[in-house]
C-alpha cells in the first residue's frame, strides 16, 4: 500500500508575543488509503497543530518546514483551484461543533454550502444529497433537520451533522480532532461507530486525534503518541497499551484510573506536560521520566525502528519489556 | 453504613417551569464517605449539586447537612457563611473559577478571613502555607496570578480554597474532567491523601466511570432527573443491574472495545436538546 498522506520531518513555529515559538519538531507520519491512524497526546503536545498543518489551516504568520504530500502532491505548493480541490478531499471534524457552525444560518445552508462551492452542484440536488448523508449518520427526517438552526440540536446530533456535511464532498482523508471529547460517553460510542463504519464502507483514511489512549487503541490501526511537539512512539494500536516502547506511553497508560479496579495510588507522572518551545535540551520527556539518565538529558534521541514500531528513546532497546513491569510494581 | 451522616437529601425535586430537572432524589453521605453521582448531560446531577450548596432552591424535598436543615435559601449573611463552612464546591474549569487578579495566597486568605474570624494575620498566613503544602503548591506558585499557572496548578488552588473553610463535605463537580491524564492522576492522588488525613467527605459529580471507581465508595446513577441505580461503587460498576447503567458501562473505551451504534441512535436523540 502506498501512502495517501505522507508527512516528513514537519516542523512549525508560531508567532507568540512577537517571537516565533516552535510548536512542532520533526513530525513524520504516513496514512494509507482506508487506514485509521491515531494521534495521542496531552495539551501542548502538537497533535492539533499537526492536523492543522496537514489541512493548511495553520494560523497566519506560522512558519512550517518539512514535506506534506497528499496523493504524491506537495500540499504546501497548492493554491487557487488546486487548494480548493484539496479541501474537498481532506475534511476536518473539530471538537466543538458549535464553534464551527454559523448560528444564524440553518443546517441546510451550512450543509449545502461546501457542495455548491466546491462541486458546483445545484441547490435541489445538494439538498437531496444532504438528506441522504444525514440518514447515513443515523439522523432521520433529514428534510426537517435542514430547516433547523444549530441551537435546536444537541451536541451529539450537531456533531453528526458535521460528519454528514464532511461526507458530502466524499473526502479521501478525514482529520478528526477530538471529535467526541465534548460528548457524553454513550453518544461518543455512537459517533465513533459511525466514523468507523463510514471509513470501512468508503475506504476513507482517518487521522484521529485524541487524548484518550484507549479510544485511539479501539478505533485505529496504528497510533502515534506525541510529546512536546514530537512523535515519541508509533505502533500498532493493539500493542500500545500492554507493550509500549516509550516510557511516556507506558506512564500514560498507567496514570489513568480504570473502571475495573481502584488502586491505592495512581502512578502519576511528576511535573506537567510541556510544549515544544519549553522543552529542555536532550529528550523532552527526561525531566519527568523514571528511566532518564545523563545521556538522555544531553542529546535529543532520533526516532528509530524497534519491534515493528518507531520510538524516540535512547534506552528503548534495553528497556524492552520492562516498562509495564516497573509500573505494575509502582501501583 | 451506620456511621454518622454529614449530608442527607430526601425527596429532592427541582422544576424549571414545566421541565423537571431533578425528580425525587434521595442521597446520604456518611462522615469520611465518598459518594459519586453519575450521569450524562441533562441527567440532573449538577442541579443536585447546586441545590446542596445553595445555588438553587429545591422545589420540594429536604437537605440536611451536619444536622442542620438547608432546604430553604439562607436568610442573612451569617447563615450563608455557616452553610459555606459545611459544604464547599470545586468546579470543573479552573480557568473560569478563580479571580484572575488574586494569587493563591489572596484567594485562600479571603476565605479564611470570612470563615475563621478567630485567626489573626499570622495564623492565617500559617494556615495558607499549610494548605499550600497539603495541595502541593510551592511558595512561588502560591504568589503567582492564575494566568501564570497550568490547569492542574489552578485546580490545586481551587481545592485549597474549598478546604480553607474547613468544610465537612466537598462537592467535586467534574473537578478533574478538564485535566490532562498525567495531571489528573496527581489530583486524584491528592484527593485521596486529603481524605486520609482529614475527616472530609466527598460528593463527586462525574460522567467518568474510571474516576468514580478510583475515589468513591458509593454511587448513584442518574438518568433524566431520577436515580436509576445505587449501591457500592465496585458492585454497581462490576454488576450493573439497570439497562441504562449497563449501557454507560459498555460505552467506556477499553482494550478490545468496538464502538457500537446504540438502540437510541435514531430515536431518543431526535428530540430537541
Where do the PLM segments sit?
Chain A
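A short, proline-enriched helix->beta-strand linker immediately N-terminal to the Walker B motif
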Residues: 168-172
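Short catalytic/signature loops enriched in Gly
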Residues: 20, 140-146, 234-331
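Conserved ABC transporter NBD signature motif
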Residues: 63-74
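ABC ATPase NBD coupling module
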Residues: 59, 75-91, 109, 117, ...
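P-loop NTP-binding/switch modules centered on Walker-like glycine-rich loops
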Residues: 56, 175, 179, 183-264
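Conserved ABC ATPase signature
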Residues: 148-153, 157
Amino acid at each position: 500500500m502506498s501512502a495517501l498522506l505522507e508527512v516528513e520531518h514537519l516542523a512549525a513555529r508560531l508567532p507568540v508575543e512577537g517571537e516565533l515559538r516552535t510548536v512542532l519538531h520533526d513530525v513524520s507520519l504516513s496514512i494509507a488509503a482506508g487506514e485509521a491512524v491515531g494521534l495521542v497526546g496531552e495539551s501542548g503536545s502538537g497533535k492539533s497543530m499537526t492536523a492543522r498543518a496537514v489541512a493548511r489551516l495553520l494560523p497566519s504568520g506560522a512558519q512550517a518546514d518539512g514535506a506534506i504530500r497528499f496523493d504524491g502532491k506537495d500540499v504546501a505548493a497548492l493554491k487557487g483551484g488546486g487548494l480548493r480541490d484539496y479541501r474537498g478531499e481532506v475534511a476536518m471534524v473539530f471538537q466543538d461543533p458549535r464553534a464551527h457552525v454559523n448560528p444564524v444560518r440553518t443546517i441546510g445552508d451550512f450543509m449545502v454550502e461546501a457542495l455548491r462551492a466546491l462541486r458546483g452542484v445545484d441547490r435541489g440536488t445538494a439538498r437531496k444529497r444532504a438528506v441522504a448523508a444525514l440518514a447515513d449518520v443515523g439522523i432521520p427526517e433529514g428534510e426537517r433537520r435542514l430547516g433547523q438552526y444549530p441551537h435546536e440540536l444537541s451536541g451529539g446530533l450537531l456533531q453528526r451533522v458535521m460528519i454528514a456535511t464532511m461526507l458530502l464532498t466524499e473526502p479521501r482523508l478525514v482529520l478528526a480532532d477530538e471529535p467526541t471529547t465534548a460528548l457524553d460517553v454513550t453518544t461518543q460510542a455512537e459517533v465513533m461507530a459511525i466514523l468507523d463504519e463510514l471509513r470501512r464502507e468508503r475506504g476513507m483514511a482517518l487521522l484521529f486525534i485524541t487524548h484518550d489512549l484507549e479510544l485511539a487503541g479501539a478505533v485505529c490501526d496504528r497510533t502515534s503518541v506525541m510529546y512536546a511537539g514530537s512523535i515519541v512512539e508509533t505502533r500498532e494500536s493493539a500493542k500500545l497499551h500492554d507493550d509500549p516502547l516509550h516510557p511516556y506511553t507506558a506512564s500514560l497508560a498507567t496514570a489513568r484510573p480504570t473502571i475495573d479496579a481502584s488502586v491505592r495510588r495512581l502512578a502519576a507522572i511528576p511535573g506537567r506536560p510541556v510544549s515544544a518551545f519549553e522543552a529542555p535540551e536532550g529528550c523532552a520527556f527526561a525531566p519527568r521520566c523514571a528511566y532518564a539518565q545523563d545521556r538522555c538529558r544531553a542529546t535529543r534521541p532520533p526516532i528509530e525502528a524497534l519491534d515493528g514500531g518507531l520510538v524516540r528513546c535512547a534506552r528503548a532497546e534495553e528497556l524492552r519489556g520492562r516498562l509495564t513491569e516497573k509500573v505494575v510494581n509502582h501501583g | 453504613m451506620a456511621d454518622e451522616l454529614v449530608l442527607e437529601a430526601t425527596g429532592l425535586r427541582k422544576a424549571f417551569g414545566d421541565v423537571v430537572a431533578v425528580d425525587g432524589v434521595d442521597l446520604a453521605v456518611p462522615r469520611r464517605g465518598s459518594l459519586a453521582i453519575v450521569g450524562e448531560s441533562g441527567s440532573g446531577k449538577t442541579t443536585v449539586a447546586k441545590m446542596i450548596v445553595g445555588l438553587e432552591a429545591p422545589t420540594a424535598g429536604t437537605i440536611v447537612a451536619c444536622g442542620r436543615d438547608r432546604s430553604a435559601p439562607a436568610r442573612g449573611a451569617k447563615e450563608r457563611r455557616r452553610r459555606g463552612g459545611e459544604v464547599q464546591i470545586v468546579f470543573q474549569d479552573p480557568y473560569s473559577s478563580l479571580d484572575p487578579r488574586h494569587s493563591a495566597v489572596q484567594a485562600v486568605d479571603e476565605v479564611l478571613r470570612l470563615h475563621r474570624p478567630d485567626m489573626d494575620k499570622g495564623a492565617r498566613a500559617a494556615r495558607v502555607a499549610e494548605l499550600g503544602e497539603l495541595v502541593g503548591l510551592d511558595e512561588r506558585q502560591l504568589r503567582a496570578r492564575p494566568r501564570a499557572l497550568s490547569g492542574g496548578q489552578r485546580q490545586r488552588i481551587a481545592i485549597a480554597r474549598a478546604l480553607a473553610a474547613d468544610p465537612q463535605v466537598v462537592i467535586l463537580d467534574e473537578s478533574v474532567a478538564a485535566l490532562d491524564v498525567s495531571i489528573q492522576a496527581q489530583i486524584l492522588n491528592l484527593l485521596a491523601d486529603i481524605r486520609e488525613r482529614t475527616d472530609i467527605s466527598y460528593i463527586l459529580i462525574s460522567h467518568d466511570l474510571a474516576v468514580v471507581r478510583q475515589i468513591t465508595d458509593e454511587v448513584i446513577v442518574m438518568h433524566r432527573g431520577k436515580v436509576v441505580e445505587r449501591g457500592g461503587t465496585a458492585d454497581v460498576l462490576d454488576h450493573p443491574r439497570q439497562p441504562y447503567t449497563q449501557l454507560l458501562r459498555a460505552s467506556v473505551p477499553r482494550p478490545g472495545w468496538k464502538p457500537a451504534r446504540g438502540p437510541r441512535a435514531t430515536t431518543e436523540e431526535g428530540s430537541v436538546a
